[in-house]
């Protein structure tokens, strides 16, 4: 799964570069998680997980605290999750996951983004069947066999464990992501660079330079949308 690891790193690096956009999107996600349960990460596991991911993305404490305080203060915005799927040039596929307080606005914006950037939006399920929802855990290490044994002993449903560039990369069934994190923490591993649910393409395509430029414009435009939280695709050379 080396290629998949490379794509995850590339996507994470690109997002980390646009810091203000990353902070704002995590702020929305933290607020939404806090509103759905208690605004206390110790009693709200969803909120705790989002905060951990925000810290991995270097989101400052004041941004996290502001989002939680807004939820505590009785903010009346309600956010709804969504997923939009579509196609780019030459067999390229893209999934955009959204979190929005205005679904009609988001649908209109996403449709327009596809249309203006050489893509075609599809129906629900049009491309997601070609992706596997996967738990991904990344941390420093060089002994994947040992990590696999730890997870196996904890009865975590693991798809793969690899070593990539001095990091251990664990791929789990989506339902076992939190179980895998807990097992690793129990084994003394406490620092993670990634703990995410990712949609990983079952197969990938390589685009020509011309098609790649079009597709990159589509992905960038989707990621620039304030309502879009994550973008997944199947292009190997992006």
Curated annotation (Swiss-Prot):
- Cite a single GO BP annotation: regulation of DNA-templated transcription
Q: Which domain of life is it from?
A: Bacteria
Where's it mainly located?
Answer: cytoplasm
Q: Name one GO cellular component term.
A: cytosol
Its subcellular locations are:
Cytoplasm
- Output the Gene3D superfamilies linked to this UniProt entry: 1.10.10.200, 3.30.70.980
Q: Name one Pfam family in it.
A: Transcrip_reg
Provide the alphabetized UniProt keywords.
Answer: Cytoplasm, DNA-binding, Transcription, Transcription regulation
List, in alphabetical order, the Gene Ontology terms for molecular function in this entry. Answer: DNA binding
Q: Which SUPFAM superfamilies match?
A: YebC-like
Per the UniProt entry, the disulfide pairs are none
Instruction: Keyword check for Nucleotide-binding, yes or no.
Output: no
The similarity annotation says:
Belongs to the TACO1 family. YeeN subfamily.
Descriptive protein name: Probable transcriptional regulatory protein llmg_0242
Q: What is the lineage of its organism?
A: Bacteria, Bacillati, Bacillota, Bacilli, Lactobacillales
């Amino acid at each position: 799964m080396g290629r998949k690891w490379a794509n995850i790193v590339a996507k994470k690096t690109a997002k980390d570069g646009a810091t203000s956009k990353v902070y704002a999107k995590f702020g929305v996600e933290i607020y939404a998680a806090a509103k759905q349960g208690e605004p206390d990460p110790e009693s709200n596991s969803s909120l705790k997980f989002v905060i951990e991911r925000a810290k991995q993305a270097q989101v400052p404490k004041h941004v996290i605290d502001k989002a939680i305080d807004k939820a505590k203060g009785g903010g009346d915005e309600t956010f709804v999750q969504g997923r939009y799927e579509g196609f780019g040039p030459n067999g390229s596929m893209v999934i955009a996951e959204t979190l929005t307080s205005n679904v009609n606005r988001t649908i209109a914006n996403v449709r327009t983004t596809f249309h203006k950037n050489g893509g075609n939006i599809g129906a629900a399920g049009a491309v997601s069947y070609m992706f596997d929802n996967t738990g991904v855990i990344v941390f420093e290490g060089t002994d994947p066999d040992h990590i696999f044994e730890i997870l196996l002993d904890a009865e975590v449903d693991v798809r793969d464990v690899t070593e990539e560039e001095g990091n251990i990369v664990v791929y789990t069934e989506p339902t076992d992501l939190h179980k895998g994190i807990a097992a690793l923490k129990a084994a003394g591993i406490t620092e993670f660079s990634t703990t995410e649910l990712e949609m990983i393409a079952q197969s990938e395509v390589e685009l020509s330079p011309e098609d790649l430029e079009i597709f990159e414009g589509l992905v960038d435009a989707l990621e620039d949308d304030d309502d879009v939280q994550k973008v997944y695709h199947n292009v190997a050379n992006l």
